[in-house]
UniProtKB/Swiss-Prot annotation:
The keyword Lipid metabolism does not apply. InterPro entries: Ac-CoA_synth_d_su_TIM-brl, ACDS_complex_subunit, CO_DH/Ac-CoA_synth_dsu, Dihydropteroate_synth-like_sf. Belongs to the CdhD family. It holds the Pfam family CdhD. Heterodimer of delta and gamma chains. The ACDS complex is made up of alpha, epsilon, beta, gamma and delta chains with a probable stoichiometry of (alpha(2)epsilon(2))(4)-beta(8)-(gamma(1)delta(1))(8). Pathway: One-carbon metabolism; methanogenesis from acetate. Keywords: Methanogenesis. SUPFAM superfamilies: Dihydropteroate synthetase-like. The lineage of its organism: Archaea, Methanobacteriati, Methanobacteriota, Stenosarchaea group, Methanomicrobia. This is Acetyl-CoA decarbonylase/synthase complex subunit delta.
Length: 436
């Protein structure tokens, strides 16, 4: 085998010699390019391209050598041309495929079904009972039918508060009467439930006594016959007392007490729920492990039955962390379906949080160079709709909402997917040229 030399070896060999020119001397050899570092195999097309480029490189070396007086032959053979790739045959038909509903073995656990509201047959006065949960698969998947559709509860407050203009114009004439507000939500806006927020009980707002706040709950119960959720002000010191008194005046109605959390006396709220026949909303802040901990404490420390717990893992609005809320809810639902019995509960979303995003209610961008945001009368409801629908796909069951248009659109879409609303079939095969 011939000894291999590098061009630098030839230069070094003549470095110590007083040679000005070589006459009658021909240096023969081949130039080799080491491609050993390439991974993933050697493509024939790449080989042809490298051969062509190497031939050009050899010609350059020959010309340079000629400039210095070295005899060289320029007539090197041209590199072989790269053969054009064969044209792919024109596709006439799609590859035939058949979709079969999968039976995912990992989804072995059913989500707990939780009733809200007691009818006369159950010892209460509600006109209907709402059921949430009961799923055996992710929402709207064909793997297992959803036993219960998504439910919407519309917010009512025990005092006049500041609302986005697009929301306020729907309620302005009833905001001083929680009972009339609740009645309008049910009769005109088709609310499945009502959530009464006792925000005036906050010591920094009106510091309304629990006994007086309980009268507002009675007013709402008499005004409507749908199930209700009862919320406090968010004050961790006062909420347990307020919710306990509200639970007492609503005894036997199976309301949803909102909410028990790790930063307040959850045991007092759980005790009131058990004593007066209510459900408990287990609220945490975008933390699946905290949700597991609170659920575990409600079940094992407070002896709350599984069919009385609904989770609220927190809703972050579109543009303000919706991706975190979605991921958290989806992880919770997947873990539950795969057997985590500390998470096998239906979920609730404070979808109204969408109105906390400034993009939902501001007239336009504060930046002069920004683009037009469009009319807020449309933008605001869309913000709430997108927030709600995103979490519906993640597995949420109950939606706390405000704008009547948002409520109508979310119910229309989710009930269409659920199968209770028939819609015109759309040909999706021609989706590129379809007109909306």
């Amino acid at each position: 085998m011939a000894k291999k030399m590098k061009l630098s070896d030839i230069t070094n060999m003549f470095a110590g010699m007083d040679v000005e020119a070589l006459e009658g001397v021909t240096i023969e050899g081949d130039i080799e390019i080491d491609l050993g570092g390439l991974g993933g195999g050697f493509d024939p097309m790449l080989a042809a391209a490298l051969g062509q480029e190497s031939a050009v490189l050899a010609q350059h070396f020959a010309r340079i050598a000629g400039m210095f007086g070295y005899p060289v032959g320029i007539g090197a053979p041209a590199a072989p041309a790269i053969s054009p790739a064969l044209a792919a045959p024109k596709l006439k038909d799609l590859i035939p495929a058949k979709f079969d509903v999968a039976n995912i073995a990992e989804w072995a656990t059913q989500i707990q079904e939780v009733p809200i509201g007691n009818t006369s047959a159950d010892g209460g006065s509600r006109g209907k009972r709402v059921l949430v949960g009961g799923e055996k698969a992710l929402p709207f998947f064909p793997d297992a039918p959803m036993p219960n559709r998504n439910q919407v509860t519309i917010d009512v407050f025990d005092m006049r508060i500041g609302l986005a203009k697009a929301v306020k114009e729907n309620y302005d004439e009833v905001m001083d009467s929680p009972g009339e507000w609740a009645k309008k939500n049910v009769e005109k806006f088709n609310a499945d439930m009502i959530t009464i927020h006792l925000i005036s009980t906050d010591p920094l707002v009106k510091d309304t006594p629990p006994k007086e706040a309980a009268k507002t709950v009675e007013e709402v119960l008499q005004a409507v016959d749908v199930p209700i959720a009862i919320g406090g002000s968010g004050n961790p010191q006062k909420d347990p007392e307020v919710l306990a008194r509200a639970a007492e005046v609503a005894e036997g109605e199976r309301c949803l007490l909102a909410s028990a959390s790790l930063n307040l006396d959850y045991a007092a709220i759980a005790e009131a729920a058990l004593k007066y026949d209510h459900d408990v909303l287990s609220w945490t802040q975008l933390d699946m492990n905290a949700q597991k901990e609170l659920n575990r404490k409600l079940m094992k420390q407070c002896n709350v039955p599984r069919d009385r717990i609904i989770m609220d893992p927190t809703t972050a609005a579109l543009g303000y962390g919706l991706d975190y809320a979605y991921t958290n809810m989806e992880r919770i639902r997947l873990a539950a379906l795969m057997g985590d019995d500390e998470l096998t509960f239906p979920m609730s979303s404070g979808t109204t949080n969408a109105w906390g995003a400034r993009e939902s209610w501001m007239v336009g961008s504060p930046l002069k160079e920004d683009s037009d945001w469009g009319p807020r009368e449309y933008r605001g409801p869309i913000w709430e709709i997108v927030t709600g629908l995103s979490l519906a796909i993640a597995g949420n069951d109950l939606f706390m909402m405000m704008h009547p248009t948002s409520v109508a659109v979310l119910k229309q879409i989710t009930q269409t997917l659920f199968g209770t609303i028939d819609t015109e079939q759309v040909d999706i095969a021609n989706w590129i040229g379809a007109e909306v």
